[in-house]
Each structure stands twice: as C-alpha cells, then as structure tokens.
Amino acid sequence: MAAQTLDDLPTPALILDRAILRRNLKRMSDRLRDAGVALRPHLKTAKSVEIGRMAVEGHDGRITVSTLAEARYFADGGFSDILYGVGIVPSKLPAVAELRRRGVNLRCVTDNVAVARAIAGAARAGDTFSVFIEIDSGAGRAGLPWPDLPGLLDIARILHEAPGVELAGVMTHAGHSYHESTPDGLAAVAEQERRAIVGAAERLRQAGIPCPIVSAGSTPTAVHSRNFAGINEMRPGVYVFNDLDQEFIGSCAPTDLALSVLASVIGHYPHRNQMLIDAGALALSKDISAQEFKPQVGFGTIVDAPVRDMAVVACSQEHGFVGAGEPIPYGNLPVGSRVRILPNHACITAAAYDRYYVVDSELDGGRSVVGTYDRINGW
C-alpha cells in the first residue's frame, strides 16, 4: 500500500489506533490470566482475523462469534475452537455440522428443550455437536432465568445422554451491566452474573451431569468483577476498542478508545451553529447508549474539538449534523477538512465498514496509515 495519511483516505472511513488496541488487549489478557480464567474473546466487535489473532496471543485460541458467517471466516483464518454465541435453531444445524466436519470445534448454544431434541436427533443421524446451555443472569434477553432455571435438567439430560453430543457447559451474558456507572454497581452485577452461572453449573453437577465450562462475560463485568470463583471462562468483546459508552460507565479511560470514524466537513450553517459532515446514520449508527450517562454526546463526539461539547447531534442517512456548546470556529474547520468521531457503540458503528484503516498514535500521533485489517460482515 502506498504511503497514506488520514487526508488521503475516502470518507467516511473507519480508523483504528493500533497502539491503543494493543494496550486494551494486553490489559484484559493480563487481568484474566492473573485471575486464572480462560479468555474467549467475543469477536463480534472486531470481526477481523488480524485482531482476533492479537486478542488470543498468549492464550489457547478459543473465541466467540455471533454469526455463522463469522464462524466460517474465523475457521478459514485458522481458529478451531469457536463458540457461536446466539441461540441455535434446527435449520442452522447443518451449517454447524459442516464446519465441525472440517475439524472446527464449533460450539452452539440453546435454552430450549425442543432445540436440544433436534440437536440429539441430528447427532443420531451421524453428526456431532458441542453445546452450551444459556443462563439468564439478569439481563432479560436469552437464557433460562436464574434462580428457577426452568427446564435446565431436562435440556441437560437430553444433551448429555445423546450419542455424539458434548454438553460443553453453561454460559451467560450480563448485558444489564451496561446500565451501571459506578464501580460498586458494576461489581454487584458481576457478582450476580457469577452467582447465577456458578449456581447453574452446581445444579447440573449435583444431578450427576458434568459441566466442564462455566462461561460468563461482558466487558464491564470482566473489568469490574471482584470474584471469579467458579468461573473458568470469560467472553468480553468491546474491550478491544472501547467506546463512549464504556468510558462513561467506567470500564475504560478516555485514552482507551481505539476506534473512530473519519469524515469530511461538507457544509457550514452558522445561523444554527452547526456544520454537516458526510458521516450519517449508516456511517455512525443511531445507537444512543452513551446518552444515558451524558446526553450531549449525541451520536458521537468530535476528536480534538476546538470548542466544548462538539458532537454529532443528529443524523440522516448520509448526513451528520455537528453542533457544539459554544460558537463553532468555522475558520478552523473549512469545507473539505477532516474530523474524527468517537462512537457511542463501537460494535454497531464498525458494522458498516469492510475494513479498518490502521494508524498508530505511538509512531506519528496517528496521522499516517500503517495498514488495513479486513472485516467480515453479514450473516
């Protein structure tokens, strides 16, 4: 690739600071290694083989994905222990089986008796499966709700007794951690998550059913947990990049945000103290998660803004409306100049792009493009 700077790139473009990425990866890697907990990073955020390889460096290589397209992509990239972390349906079992026949230990997830029976039936036809039972530790999304765990033993027995099926363990995701913003509050959610998933594992073991893997994880609970006892695997994801939401809930510092969107200024509107950029809803997403804690961030904040509270305050499909808490100095930001926007939710913002343009703030302040990483999108 010919030498490029940020000024040479088409806009909008997805910019990744490699130096910050590496620091984020090392911080989580060291934390879980010191705790004696296996790291299975959730690569739905990065969706990149290059970043995935960096994330598992020094660990055993296990990963989590959220689509079958990701599973195929990472399998082609050499990953062999992959958890497909979205509840499986019978129509997708042939795709799982196909990857497993290639030697990939693609594991699936269920919280449903009928699906467990379908998995057992597919195994009787000659395929093999590795399955986690999903537990709801308080997020209210998927999983058997703790503490009642209705159907846990029925599902577990179907899977455990089926030839060709491995009951890999139990897993949970404390998604409600994203609504806390104090260390004590986040630690409390992490402990709730731990008690639920360890309790589910103990219930299986008391019934004589093995439960090898006890898997939990979100970035906030991985960062703020004060007790990993009984958990032997964590699945954080957004920690690789971080974002405004993670900053505001206290999972990272402002200097830990590795991802931004590069956009061009396309119009000045001083009568309303706004300017337009060519990054709108499709380039940034309309995720407003960070507004729960700091409403003025809008749909993303401007990096190195010349005035206070400069942010994307509204979006249409391809237009971003930039406002500020003070008069915008338009002379500093002429039409055609570039700005970078920090996203509210890195996972959703990154999903619009097919590649990362990689910079390194430790080399030249992050002005030069030092490479690209590809991404997998779709399902």
Residue ranges and their predicted role:
Residues 1-16:
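Generic N-terminal amphipathic, Lys/Arg-enriched alpha-helix
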Residues 20-51, 62-64:
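N-terminal glycine-rich anion-binding loops that anchor highly charged ligand groups
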Residues 21, 44, 74, 133, ...:
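Conserved, mostly hydrophobic/aromatic
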Residues 42-179:
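Active-site-proximal beta-alpha core segment in soluble small-molecule metabolic enzymes
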Residues 137-253:
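Active-site loop/helix belt of alpha/beta enzymes
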Residues 188, 221-301:
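Active-site loop ensemble at the mouth of alpha/beta enzyme cores that anchors a bound cofactor
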Residues 270-379:
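C-terminal accessory subdomain/extension
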